[in-house]
A protein has these predicted regions:
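Short, Lys/Arg-rich, polar N-terminal cytosolic tail immediately upstream
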Residues: 1-34
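A structural signal for multi-pass alpha-helical bundles of membrane permease subunits
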Residues: 4-12, 20, 39-333
Length: 333
């Protein structure tokens, strides 16, 4: 009798569970939980895969950069060096003329960034608020500059700057940036125009009632509210100028008195022999350096890491503001 009663209780419990399980409310909650869990798993796998693709080569090159030059031809060394050394950084520093080139590159990028911000912000504000005859056509031409490669206009640019006597000087870069013709200026004008167009017109109307003119309204009202666009454009302008080789080569900006990291990295082969001769280790890998592509690739990678390091450090300090500004300006992709 007790056994039958026990089985009956189990059956009742099972029936209650089945009834509760099939209730629409619980069924919806269960389906929602499954979808959320599945979405989280897929998202996590995707992010791990993306991080691996991005971080794997960086970590690999970072470990290889501490490999002693004598281990270059050692097939047993794949990831972890057998002999740890900073000799590669010492050689790369000589190849890049690193301390001097770092200061020169930072100076060029920073001043160019400030000039780009000033010129493109003014142009973006004019296109968004100051409607004048032909403004639509002019803005269309600005958009076209985004898709036209800089190589298409390099010949007239070279001729004009040569006639102005600006070749071999960083003033050529400053002039282009200040006139809204710098690297990717069309994109920056588009960003500022879109941002200013999204601000309420009541801000300007209030300023005009108080007697503010166009420039005062721009400087005191519009620009302080464009913090997101300023951070976005500023970072892009700085990084793109930092990595530029096209205009630096076209206008012959790089020279012994004003070395640039990007150009020294581009010509690492030419500087490597001089650096090794200077250090008295031209045969440190057992043969002529030009005959050893592994050593050449190693020094190139180390030089790239040294060039990239200041940008990574800068990004660590501004990553929060940069992400917020990207969300405000609506840039995707």
């Amino acid at each position: 009798m007790d056994k039958i009663s026990y089985i009956s209780k189990i059956k009742n419990k099972f029936d209650e569970f089945k009834e509760d399980f099939n209730k629409p409310y619980n069924k919806n909650r269960r389906n929602k939980f499954i979808k959320t869990a599945f979405s989280s798993i897929v998202r996590t796998i995707f992010l791990f895969g993306l991080c691996f693709v991005i971080l794997f080569p960086t970590i690999q090159q970072l470990l290889m950069s501490f490999r002693a030059p004598s281990d270059i031809n050692n097939p047993a060394v794949i990831w972890i060096p057998m002999q740890w050394s900073i000799e590669n950084y010492s050689i790369s520093s000589l190849v890049l003329d690193y301390p001097k080139a770092l200061v020169s590159t930072f100076t060029l990028s920073f001043i160019s960034m400030i000039l780009q911000l000033a010129s493109t912000a003014l142009a973006g504000y004019a296109f968004s608020r100051l409607k004048f005859k032909g403004s639509g056509i002019l803005f269309l031409l600005v958009v076209i500059t985004i898709i036209v490669p800089p190589q298409a206009v390099q010949l007239p640019q070279y001729v004009y700057f040569n006639n102005l006597g600006l070749l071999g000087s960083q003033n050529s870069i400053y002039l282009m940036s200040g006139l809204g013709m710098g690297i990717r200026s069309g994109i920056f004008i588009y960003i500022f125009r879109s941002f200013f167009a999204g601000l309420p017109k009541e801000l300007e109307e209030s300023a005009q009632i108080d007697g503010a003119g166009v420039f005062r309204t721009f400087w005191q009202i519009m620009l302080p509210n464009a913090r997101g666009a300023i951070i976005t454009v500023g970072l892009f302008a700085f990084v793109w100028q930092w990595n530029d080789t096209h205009f630096a080569s076209l206008f012959e900006v790089d020279h012994d008195g004003f070395p640039l990291l990007s150009m020294r990295l581009l010509n690492v082969v030419d500087g490597l022999r001089q650096a090794l001769t200077y250090k008295g280790i031209i045969g440190l890998v057992g043969q002529e350096v030009t005959d050893n592509p592994l050593f050449l690739a190693l020094i190139t990678n180390v030089s790239a890491l040294m060039m990239m390091a200041p940008l990574l450090i800068m990004y660590l300090f501004v990553q929060k503001q940069f992400v917020e500004s990207i969300e405000r300006t609506g840039i995707v992709g």
